[in-house]
Amino acid sequence: MDSIKILQDTVKARHSVRQYTDQPIANEVVTALQDRIKAINAESGLHLQLVVNEPQAFDSFMAHYGKFSGVSNYLALIGSGDRLDERCGYYGEQVVLLAQQLGLNSCWVGMTFKKVVSALDIRRGEKLTAVVALGYGQTQGVSHKVKTISEVSSCQGAMPDWFRQGVECALLAPTAVNQQKFRFELLGDKVRATASWAPFSKMDLGIVKYHFELGAGVGPDIWA
């Protein structure tokens, strides 16, 4: 089975999980995640960081209000520069899907955590945009209702299979409160991806663009 097919299957298997067991993440899993994060940071210019065995970020009223429990590991999405939220979404989701392949569960988190400065290395000019809770879930999560292909995409004439498959994969991507405020438009041999305004919609756009690439079997040069 090729790597793209494995990732496509991973997309279908992954669901958001908010309650975790106290099982520590295995050392070899931590190493694999750190290796991927190092490569992503070198490619993207971001400063993503894996934090393990640190429960303070989710020990707050808002975290409990968001029904998070047992979270002591997370991916911190940190960086600077243009289109920061979108880039964090695009590259952060790559770590999320690797974590799923390695047996972990996850949940993208916007504002229900507190920044633990001592656990993070935030340099001058950098911003913490969000975190992703990681760990061994008490459950595997559940699927949620998604929009139809026609609600989030458009093209002139018959829709090519590759474009349809890209949109289908994007519809399985996590978005803030399942809002799916994105749209794909086929323009010849290019695709325009846009997001209407909503909380975290730019980060969502990065996530769904990566999903589209996986489903369609294309690279980032597809974008108009």
Where are these regions (language model features)?
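Acidic, surface-exposed loops and disordered segments
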Residues: 1-224
